[in-house]
Amino acid sequence: YKVVLAEHQNYYPDISFVKAADESVRFAVDFKTTYRNPKKPHLCNGFTLGSHGEYFENRTSTKNIQFPYGSYSGHFCLGIIYDRADGATIDETKSHNIDELQAITSVAKNFQFFVTEKWMIASDKGGSGNTANIGSINNIADIVAGRGMFSKLGEHWFDEYWMNYKKITVQDGNGGTKKISTLREFVEYKNGDVSLI
């Protein structure tokens, strides 16, 4: 495989693995980092899993993506979950010589690594405020095991949900309308099996 780095900082994914003998075989790998919640160490802060905007909806689009989304055989996260170092006081403006490397205070510790397909650790909530990003689950054991909200439903449900996130309008039962914004509402709307959520 050849390693193709993202051409721009805001492109998805961070790295594309492209088969040398057949360049139509590609795998997307995005690097993700987050920290453990110090008061609830079984939880982490979560992270974004990429956009659910243009390139996610239009699988042939080349906007903000290295290769069209639909041309990848799989979309993976290589992640690091860590603890923030307690009480580390650091002067971020201070420079150090290379021979002082062992004396530099670390701001992170207790690293845990994971690799999983991104749809397997997705939640049904956006990941970053106003931007069109998919959010992750935040239970660390579930992240490492790939037990996100879509893991029993399958990748098709992940794709359908995020392509339609907050776009489908339904009656709210009180004479008004609302946008579908939870996986349960979406699965019910599509007559799916909500017990798989």
Task: Kindly label every feature range from the protein language model.
Residues 2-11, 21-27, 33-197:
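Nucleic-acid endonuclease domains
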Residues 13-15:
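Acidic helix-start/capping segments at beta-turn-to-alpha-helix junctions
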